Amino acid sequence: MWRSARRTPLYYPDAVTLLADAVPSDVLAGIDTSPGCSIKDSFAAQDFTSHGFAELFTAHWIYRLPEARPASGLRAEEVGTAAGLRAWQSAWHGGDDAPDVFRPALLDEPDVVVLALRSGEELAGGVVLNRGSGVVGLSNLFAVDGEETAVWSAAVAAAAARWPELPLAGYEHGDDLEHALACGFVALGPLRVWMRR
């Protein structure tokens, strides 16, 4: 079990189950369960409705072996400045008033890369890649103006260029899951995110 005794930033869970047999009362112990609290059940195995939580979404863990990378017409450009990160975050959020969840200190982390994916000079999308123990995490992928297929391909190609020996992992749902599967990922199993209303 991972948990934070203090409320986490927006979009980050207050607790994460690390074992399928976690018990809801154990998950809730030691966290602020007031409205806004969120829990990521990594196995979609628990039901928190009797504790005042509602399901926010169900997604699937995705995984891709480090095999042939897809061709992409997009150029991957590493975001390296605070101003560049603010512009990336605004595009990720879909416009103005983006929450400040990507801090400039992130750019100094050696195992984290924030990428702007460009068609010429135009931003087509972006992704965050983070290297962990034997795997590269892929998160916060977004596409601008219906470029999903090209953005997924570019994200996979960029990860393979940087860390060619490592597989990719993440989680997605809805149309994003379909794009991931079309790009060579496989769905491993469900996860569920709960929110206290």
Q: Which functions belong to the PLM regions below?
A:
Residues 16-22, 140-148:
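A short, internal acetyl-CoA/4′-phosphopantetheine-binding micro-motif in the GNAT/acyltransferase core
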Residues 146-158:
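Conserved acetyl-CoA pyrophosphate-binding loop and the N-cap/start of the following alpha-helix
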Residues 1-36, 42-45, 94-111:
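N-terminal charged segments
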